[in-house]
UniProtKB/Swiss-Prot annotation:
<feature type="transmembrane region" description="Helical">
    <location>
        <begin position="16"/>
        <end position="36"/>
    </location>
</feature>
<keyword id="KW-0808">Transferase</keyword>
<feature type="domain" description="HAMP">
    <location>
        <begin position="208"/>
        <end position="260"/>
    </location>
</feature>
<feature type="domain" description="Histidine kinase">
    <location>
        <begin position="268"/>
        <end position="480"/>
    </location>
</feature>
<feature type="topological domain" description="Cytoplasmic">
    <location>
        <begin position="1"/>
        <end position="15"/>
    </location>
</feature>
<dbReference type="InterPro" id="IPR003661">
    <property type="entry name" value="HisK_dim/P_dom"/>
</dbReference>
<dbReference type="InterPro" id="IPR005467">
    <property type="entry name" value="His_kinase_dom"/>
</dbReference>
<protein>
    <recommendedName>
        <fullName>Sensor histidine kinase CusS</fullName>
        <ecNumber>2.7.13.3</ecNumber>
    </recommendedName>
</protein>
<dbReference type="Pfam" id="PF00672">
    <property type="entry name" value="HAMP"/>
</dbReference>
<feature type="topological domain" description="Periplasmic">
    <location>
        <begin position="37"/>
        <end position="186"/>
    </location>
</feature>
<dbReference type="InterPro" id="IPR003660">
    <property type="entry name" value="HAMP_dom"/>
</dbReference>
<dbReference type="Pfam" id="PF21085">
    <property type="entry name" value="CusS"/>
</dbReference>
<feature type="modified residue" description="Phosphohistidine; by autocatalysis">
    <location>
        <position position="271"/>
    </location>
</feature>
<dbReference type="GO" id="GO:0071280">
    <property type="term" value="P:cellular response to copper ion"/>
</dbReference>
<keyword id="KW-0186">Copper</keyword>
<keyword id="KW-1003">Cell membrane</keyword>
<keyword id="KW-0067">ATP-binding</keyword>
Length: 480
């Protein structure tokens, strides 16, 4: 199957220029059409008024009952000679022409090709193509006339209730047609020039209008990894670009946060790994510096094994967090009773709690959730391990389970020294410690709470922490 070649969309400047120019040119042509149509209607009304005026004059002569036909025709010829660009034809009741304009063909011969005049408002008015003849023009000497506007009407004394004549009057409209054609040609020429000007003006206007976009683009191009704290000012751009600038600022803020976290993460993990590696090297060098007994070598190996185990756990935890960061942490959900899961975690920590003189207590109902049992037990284990680490001897750690508004909450409470408010938002950050100096006395690697948050988020839940004089409370909220 042959794929279609990639075709880049037209630029915004091209599209804007095309549509604005098209709209403007269309508006101009619409105006030109209205003008031409108005002129045509005006000329048609003017011609019809002239025809009615002529017909009224001739009708008075032909309707006179006391005149003979010869006398009527003589009077008719005298009147017609006073009109230029007008042809007359008079037919009797038998359809025979009794008079037509001297020196001109009989217009009745051309009436079979007559068509109704659509520009005439009311009345039976027709357009004729022919006869062709030279006649005086409007200030232009003689000109060829071949297009006529014609009316016909019954006139003359009544015989058997019907007029004895039918009068045909044709008025030349060639001057009007020439005027309209000249006007159309001038409008077309003007439209062509204006269209070209409009395209260039719109191109210039669009180029000027896109200046803020180019300005924003230059500002964005100047932002490097060292300038992630730079923000664009939405007040300095047009309102149409404000949302774009705000979105960019939000994006760069997220990038800065991720970049900062990654930098800190790299520094922290390098520091965390460097210390056990240094210990391994130091212990090994000391062991090799002189002859050692088997017991001393075994002690060194056990110490090295402890450091290696700690490093392996840290690497495993980091891989787990990397999966969470890449949305690859997919829980294998099944219906669980959280009371049972808490009991299993209690069984695991029971010996350690007794050794430290701390009591473990569960309070609550049998809360049902859909979740991954291994992940949830790991999250609970990390919270309980953290609570055991900071709970004074003789105190009690309480784990509560409750259902609130179709949500299940697991609360881990432990008494102890309260955590300062400024530290609470960062407790779930990797390698973050409230007291950085306490790194090696059983406090762990500093990523346990980060793992808790990743597991809870993977289950579409939330985790929060509060701390006061009564102790510290971690609250996991999961969908029921």
């Amino acid at each position: 199957m042959v794929s279609k070649p990639f075709q880049r969309p037209f630029s915004l400047a091209t599209r804007l220029t095309f549509f604005i120019s098209l709209a403007t040119i269309a508006a101009f042509f619409a105006f030109a059409w209205i003008m031409i149509h108005s002129v045509k209607v005006h000329f048609a009304e003017q011609d019809i008024n002239d025809l009615k005026e002529i017909s009224a004059t001739l009708e008075r002569v032909l309707n006179h009952p006391d005149e003979t036909q010869a006398r009527r025709l003589m009077t008719l010829e005298d009147i017609v000679s006073g009109y230029s660009n007008v042809l007359i034809s008079l037919a009797d009741s038998q359809g025979k022409t009794v008079y037509h304009s001297p020196g001109a063909p009989d217009i009745r011969e051309f009436t079979r090709d007559a068509i109704p005049d659509k520009d005439a408002q009311g009345g039976e008015v027709y357009l004729l193509s022919g006869p062709t003849m030279m006649m005086p023009g409007h200030g232009h000497g003689h000109m060829e006339h071949s297009n006529w506007r014609m009316i016909n009407l019954p006139v003359g004394p009544l015989v058997d209730g019907k007029p004895i004549y039918t009068l045909y009057i044709a008025l030349s409209i060639d001057f009007h047609l020439h005027y309209i054609n000249d006007l159309m040609n001038k409008l077309i020429m003007t439209a062509s020039v204006i269209s070209i000007l409009i395209v260039f003006i719109v191109l210039l206007a669009v180029h000027k209008g896109h200046a803020p976009i180019r300005s924003v683009s230059r500002q964005i191009q100047n932002i490097t990894s060292k300038d992630l704290d730079v923000r664009l000012d939405p007040q300095t751009v047009p309102i149409e670009l404000e949302q774009l600038v705000l979105s960019f600022n939000h994006m760069i803020e997220r990038i800065e946060d991720v970049f900062t976290r990654q930098s800190n993460f790299s520094a922290d993990i390098a520091h965390e790994i460097r210390t056990p590696i240094t210990n391994l090297i130091t212990q090994t060098e000391i062991a090799l510096s002189q002859s050692r007994s088997q017991k001393e070598l075994e002690d060194v190996l056990y110490s090295n094994l402890e450091e290696l185990t700690r490093m392996a756990k840290m690497v495993s935890d980091m891989l787990f967090l990397a999966q969470a960061d890449n949305n690859q942490l997919i829980p294998e959900k099944k219906m669980l009773n959280l009371a049972d899961e808490v009991g299993k975690v209690f069984d695991f920590f029971e010996a350690l709690a007794e050794d430290r003189g701390v009591e473990l207590r569960f309070v609550g109902d049998k809360c049902q959730v859909a979740g991954d049992p291994l992940m949830l037990r790991r999250a609970l284990s990390n919270l309980l391990s953290n609570a055991l680490r900071y709970t004074p001897t003789g105190e009690t750690i309480v784990v509560r389970c409750q259902t609130v508004d179709h949500l299940v909450q697991v609360i881990v409470e432990n008494p102890g020294t309260p955590i300062a408010p400024e530290h609470l938002p960062r407790l779930f950050d990797r390698f973050y410690r409230v007291d950085p100096s306490r790194q090696r006395k059983g406090e762990g690697s500093g990523i346990g709470l980060a793992i808790v948050k990743s597991i809870v988020v993977a289950h579409k839940g939330t985790v929060a922490v509060t701390s006061d004089a009564r102790g510290t409370r971690f609250v996991i909220t999961l969908p029921a």
